[in-house]
Design a protein with these regions (language model features):
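Generic low-polarity alpha-helical segments
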Residues: 19, 27-30, 137, 241, ...
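Bacterial Sec-dependent N-terminal signal peptides
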Residues: 1-14, 29
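Non-catalytic propeptide/linker segments at domain boundaries
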Residues: 37-189
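Substrate-binding cleft of extracellular glycoside hydrolase catalytic domains
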Residues: 179-313, 320-321
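Sec-dependent signal peptide cleavage junction
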Residues: 21-38, 44
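Surface-exposed substrate-engagement region within the catalytic domains
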Residues: 65, 73-76, 80, 87-88, ...
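Bacterial N-terminal signal peptides
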Residues: 14-22
């Protein structure tokens, strides 16, 4: 999942998300990176308000393009951060040099899953094809003069749950806060401003976050199975409870099959109980974070039927543990590929996507997230 860089002052950065009261998640920035500053009524975005999209990664307006892409990076590789790409075989390469990356903190070991946020230093990033990145780099070179000029005019913008770079925006509908696409089509009404957080944000000042307009949180509990919980999960949960901030949970999957997802589900239940989180404590769902993961010696599934079994096994483990408020989280291209299954679509309640409008339209309920 996708969390932000740590810009620490009073609190640290967090991804801005908006949710409907019926529990839909709508990132105002498709995971907007922000810093919660001293002024409790504002969010200070860490992006340039005049950032030229020609210098940004495709589908990731806040991620900078590399200056070049190595000839060793194949077109069918997947770019997973500003400087890393993954081959179809699962090898991780440096985008600019083409060298294979073996750092266990980034790729894990045969028996140990890495922290998925380590590849991006905790920042938001939606995986994109290397072919698209190469095309974007070529275009960027042609516009390098204009881009350089644009960067000189950069400023920090203050906004309270801004819209995204493509025209999707906040507004009102039936006298409640709502989120719209660039054509003013309603995506979610009764929306709430929510942040997605993990240990990468350090010790968040939750009182200031609440005073600054944060209306809820999705807290990372952990990833894979057999790993420690997120180092700040207990603190974040306790603070949200103390201050009356509604919260949900997310868990990043490394499952290759239903056996792995069942272990992940059992791990989620165990840690929820360990941290004193009952089903009634969760105002937002427990999200199963399904992405194209990277783990040495292992490769993620590509068959939707396999993923369907993975999702059903995870759901079964959570439901057996008494947790019924569940949802799938992913991004558009993955949902249109390995997750292209009617049952998974029916369970999908949060989709990360940059752009002027939501391309995924198969939400099973009205509670949904962008």
């Amino acid at each position: 999942m996708i969390s932000p860089k740590s810009l620490m002052k009073i609190a640290t950065t967090a991804s801005v998300v908006a949710m409907t009261v019926s529990v839909a998640v709508v990132p105002a920035y498709a995971m907007q990176d922000i810093a919660i500053e001293d002024t409790p009524s504002s969010f200070a975005a860490t992006v340039d308000d005049v950032q030229n999209s020609s210098n940004s990664m495709p589908d990731n307006p806040n991620a900078t393009l590399p200056e070049t892409v190595s000839e060793n990076i194949s077109d069918d590789s997947t770019v997973v951060s500003e400087n890393l790409a993954v081959t179809p075989e699962g090898d991780v390469q440096n985008i600019e040099t083409g060298e294979t990356v073996t750092d266990a903190q980034l790729v894990g070991t045969q028996s140990q899953q890495p922290d998925p946020l380590a590849k991006t230093n905790g920042e938001s990033f939606i995986p994109v094809s290397a072919s698209n990145v190469k095309d974007a780099v070529e275009q960027s070179v042609k516009q390098s003069v204009e881009q350089s000029s644009s960067k000189n005019g950069a400023t920090v913008k203050l906004a309270k749950f801004d819209g995204n770079d493509y025209g999707a925006h906040w507004g009102t509908y039936n006298n409640t806060k709502a989120f719209f696409d660039y054509r003013n089509n309603l995506f979610a009404q009764q929306a709430k401003g929510v942040i997605d957080v993990s240990s990468w944000q350090g010790d968040i000042d939750w009182a200031k976050a609440k005073a600054g307009g944060v209306e809820g949180a999705i807290i990372r509990l952990g990833f894979g199975w057999g790993n420690d919980a997120d180092a700040k999960a207990q603190r974040n949960i306790n603070e949200c409870k103390r201050l009356g901030i509604p919260f949900g949970i997310y868990w990043y999957s490394y499952a290759e099959d239903a056996s792995g997802s069942r272990q992940e589900g059992n791990d989620v239940v165990s840690k929820l109980r360990q941290f004193g989180v009952s089903p009634n404590d969760l105002k937002y769902p427990v999200y199963y974070d399904l992405e194209s993961w990277t783990w040495t010696g292992h490769t993620p599934p590509t068959n939707p039927n396999v993923y369907n079994g993975i999702v059903n096994a995870w759901y079964g483990a959570l439901q057996s543990g008494g947790y019924q408020n569940l949802g799938v989280y992913s991004y558009t291209s993955y949902l249109q590929g390995p997750l292209n299954n009617a049952n998974i679509y029916a369970k999908t309640r949060w989709v990360a996507q940059y752009g002027p409008q939501m391309e995924f339209t198969a939400f099973g309920t009205n509670d949904r997230g962008w």
